[in-house]
């Protein structure tokens, strides 16, 4: 019921907009629940054609094709010599400096999450326990004699 009223009021709104010369959107809406379709009426489709005008691009004498002057242009400068030098500088700093020095920096970063240190510490502890005749691993992580438990109540 409500969807039908919505469709009716939408059609009236589109027709009123078309008769008054207001711009109406050409929208077709279909409800997924009640299968109501709202489409612009035939009145909305009868508009006067808009006047057509010839549009022509202004040709500025400043606009020039860089590829006519320099077919190997890289887009850095209008002058071919500066264009080549700017391209060489960009690629030198981009490839040589960033990639080479960047990968060197990453390679010499400190131990991430201390993985190497924990491995060395475990090897040192295993050597100490083997030298003193202790088991390599114990079930107790802490010495039970040093732990103070609360009294039973």
From Swiss-Prot:
List membrane-spanning regions: 89-109
**Principal location class:** mitochondrion
Name the InterPro entries for this protein. Answer: NADH_UbQ_OxRdtase_ESSS_su (IPR019329)
Q: Name one GO cellular component term.
A: mitochondrial inner membrane
Complex formation? Complex I is composed of 45 different subunits. Interacts with BCAP31.
Region Disordered, as annotated, extends over 49-72
Its membrane topology: Single-pass membrane protein
Q: What does this protein do?
A: Accessory subunit of the mitochondrial membrane respiratory chain NADH dehydrogenase (Complex I), that is believed not to be involved in catalysis. Complex I functions in the transfer of electrons from NADH to the respiratory chain. The immediate electron acceptor for the enzyme is believed to be ubiquinone.
Q: Does the keyword Transferase apply?
A: no
**Could you confirm whether the keyword Membrane appears in this record?**
yes
| Name this polypeptide is given | NADH dehydrogenase [ubiquinone] 1 beta subcomplex subunit 11, mitochondrial
User: Species name for this entry?
Assistant: Pongo pygmaeus
Q: Could you point out where the transit peptide sits in the sequence?
A: 1-29
Subcellular locations according to the entry: Mitochondrion inner membrane
Q: Which UniProt keywords apply?
A: Electron transport, Membrane, Mitochondrion, Mitochondrion inner membrane, Respiratory chain, Transit peptide, Transmembrane, Transmembrane helix, Transport
Describe the family membership recorded for this protein in Swiss-Prot or TrEMBL.
Answer: Belongs to the complex I NDUFB11 subunit family.
């Amino acid at each position: 019921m409500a969807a039908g009223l919505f469709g009716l009021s939408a059609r009236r709104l589109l027709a009123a907009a078309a008769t008054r010369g207001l711009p109406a959107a050409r929208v077709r809406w279909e409800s997924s629940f009640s299968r109501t379709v709202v489409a612009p009426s035939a009145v909305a489709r009868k508009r006067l054609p808009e006047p057509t005008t010839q549009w022509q691009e202004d040709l500025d004498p400043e606009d020039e094709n860089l590829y006519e002057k320099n077919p190997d242009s890289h887009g850095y400068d209008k002058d071919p010599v500066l264009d080549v030098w700017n391209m060489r500088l960009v690629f030198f700093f981009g490839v040589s400096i960033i990639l080479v020095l960047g990968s060197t920096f990453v390679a010499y970063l400190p131990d991430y999450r201390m993985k190497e240190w924990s491995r060395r510490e475990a090897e040192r502890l295993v050597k100490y326990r083997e030298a003193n005749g202790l088991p390599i691993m114990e079930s107790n992580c802490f010495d039970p004699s040093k732990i103070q438990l609360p009294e039973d109540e």
